[in-house]
Amino acid sequence: MGVIFENDWQELLKDEFEKEYYKKVRGFLVEEYRTKTIYPDKNHIFSALHYTAYKDVRVVILGQDPYHGPNQAHGLSFSVQPGVRIPPSLVNIYKELETDLGCYIPNHGYLKKWADQGVLLLNTSLTVRAGEANSHQKIGWEIFTDHIIQLLNDRKEPIVFILWGNNAISKERFITNPQHYIIKSVHPSPLSASRGFFGSKPFSKTNSFLESIGEKPIDWQIENR
């Protein structure tokens, strides 16, 4: 499970991959993938970093752990592979996007178009056992993803951090650079969306901020396939 990034994350993370905690994560995962069903496929664990280079990040949307159903997770937070039913949280994200910016609700949940525009779709835990939510939350992934958030915080160019739900909001402590813009609300899950996610307008707020610093806005419309 050696990782090779064909972008600037390679240099930024090479020392992290040599640390003792990460070697333990890797050893644990080798055994987990050998003996259990683990999501996403091991080739997709780092998709968020493969698709969105450090220098290109303009927005971060933090998720918790990958979807734990068959064929869903592919390494981008909230996104599912084409041809898979759209999960309830993403349905609510699409509903808010429709209300906020007038985007139509597409027929799939594959969000790579966002990643290609500089939206880092990062889960705080990068793997999960099939059918067992949060099952890999304590194996060391959070040390790794906290480090990524700190690297992003260190960047000179401003970034929008979108934090949905308590797990994501707990990472606000790493975002200390005042030039970054933080948008936070309850999680888009059906359990909480009506308590402050709907109507929070995160997408238009993001674009307004990007335009205010002379950046191109994100085209949030995911087209039908």
Swiss-Prot record:
Q: Which UniProt keywords apply?
A: Cytoplasm, DNA damage, DNA repair, Hydrolase
UniProt-listed PROSITE patterns: U_DNA_GLYCOSYLASE
Principal subcellular localization:
cytoplasm
EC code(s) of this entry: 3.2.2.27
- Domain of life the protein comes from: Bacteria
Query: Which reactions is this enzyme annotated as catalysing?
Result: Hydrolyzes single-stranded DNA or mismatched double-stranded DNA and polynucleotides, releasing free uracil
Q: Which Pfam families match?
A: UDG
List cellular component terms (GO).
cytoplasm
Q: What is this protein called?
A: Uracil-DNA glycosylase
* Organism the protein comes from: Alkaliphilus oremlandii (strain OhILAs) (Clostridium oremlandii (strain OhILAs))
